[in-house]
């Protein structure tokens, strides 16, 4: 399993001024890839917005793309000629020698995007990234993403759904610690995002707003093909929570509980299994009048 010394926060202040909650190294990109595999196994549908990527001719942005694993899998599933763009603040994650229809660029969601990108994407996709806004106003980051969508195009946002999780005592402790961590580093902006985002999308004038909630099984509740990956993913995330909270003010979970959490978490999820939820939220920019 992962070693605690390999997962560290790169933030210099503890308030996520650099838009990174956990580390920026191979361990972290591996964790992100495992997270993708767990979510995709439970929910193999890439796009909920009514876009048929198999028709081709679309331009898609995946912001906070990490290794580009979502792009690679969505591109393969589409099986047609589209244009794919992945952005992240950690360029070392990007794949080498991507196909001609795929490009990767450095870009922070808290900074201005290239002016020439505005209004050019049929789909802007962001997954498990918005808590990384830190103390930058969440609404500003979301407005910048919306500005990239072309008239008639779509934005799709995927984040944690913090309620109605089916976990044991250690799982409940882990969930509380993670929520406290995200709350601390984002000034309260990075949790309960569905409730925050829907009014923002409406205020921005977007239409056809809809969402769905997906349940992802872990450990003993997961299928044999993905079980080991779900366990490793949770362990790596728990290590990240345990290590990153060392540089933050105290949270509602004690230091002793945080230090013991990864190993206890692994034992519980192997024996009993857990279920966590995330939401997929999509909305359309109206056609120009």
Region spans (language model):
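A short SAM/SAH-binding and catalytic strip from SAM-dependent methyltransferases
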Residues: 121-139
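Class I SAM-dependent methyltransferase Rossmann-like catalytic core
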Residues: 2-57
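Class I SAM-dependent methyltransferase SAM/SAH-binding core
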Residues: 57-115, 123
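Helix-to-beta-strand junctions that scaffold the AdoMet/dcAdoMet cofactor pocket
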Residues: 79, 133-134, 149-151
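C-terminal lobe and adjacent flexible extensions of AdoMet/dcAdoMet transferase-like proteins
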Residues: 204-207, 214-289
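A short glycine-rich, Lys/Arg-flanked "PGG" loop and its adjoining helix->strand segment in the class I
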Residues: 139-154
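Conserved catalytic/acceptor-binding region of the Class I
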Residues: 150, 154-237, 247
């Amino acid at each position: 399993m992962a070693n605690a010394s390999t997962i560290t926060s790169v933030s210099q202040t503890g308030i996520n001024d650099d838009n990174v909650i956990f580390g920026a190294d191979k361990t972290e990109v591996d964790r992100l890839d495992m997270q993708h595999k767990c979510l995709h196994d439970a929910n193999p549908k890439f796009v909920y917005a009514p876009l048929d990527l198999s028709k081709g001719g679309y331009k898609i942005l995946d912001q906070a793309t990490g290794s580009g694993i979502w792009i690679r899998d969505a591109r393969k599933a589409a099986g047609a000629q589209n244009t794919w763009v992945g952005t992240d603040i950690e360029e070392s994650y990007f794949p080498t020698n991507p196909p001609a229809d795929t490009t990767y660029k450095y870009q922070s969601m808290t900074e201005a995007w290239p002016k020439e990108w505005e209004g050019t994407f049929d789909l802007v996709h962001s997954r498990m990234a918005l808590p990384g806004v830190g103390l930058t106003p969440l609404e500003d980051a979301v407005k910048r993403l919306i500005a990239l969508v072309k008239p008639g195009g779509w934005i799709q946002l995927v984040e944690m759904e913090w309620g109605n999780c089916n976990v044991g005592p250690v799982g409940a402790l882990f969930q509380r610690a993670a929520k406290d961590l995200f709350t601390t580093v984002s000034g309260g902006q990075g949790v309960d995002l569905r409730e925050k985002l829907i009014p923002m999308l409406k205020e921005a004038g977007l239409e056809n707003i809809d969402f769905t909630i997906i349940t992802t099984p872990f450990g003993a509740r997961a299928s044999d093909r993905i079980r080991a990956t779900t366990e490793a993913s949770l362990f790596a995330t728990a290590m990240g929570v345990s290590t990153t909270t060392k540089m933050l003010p105290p949270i509602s979970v004690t230091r002793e509980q945080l230090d013991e959490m990864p190993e206890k978490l692994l034992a519980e999820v192997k024996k009993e299994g857990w279920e966590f939820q995330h939401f997929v939220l999509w909305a359309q920019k109206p056609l120009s009048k």
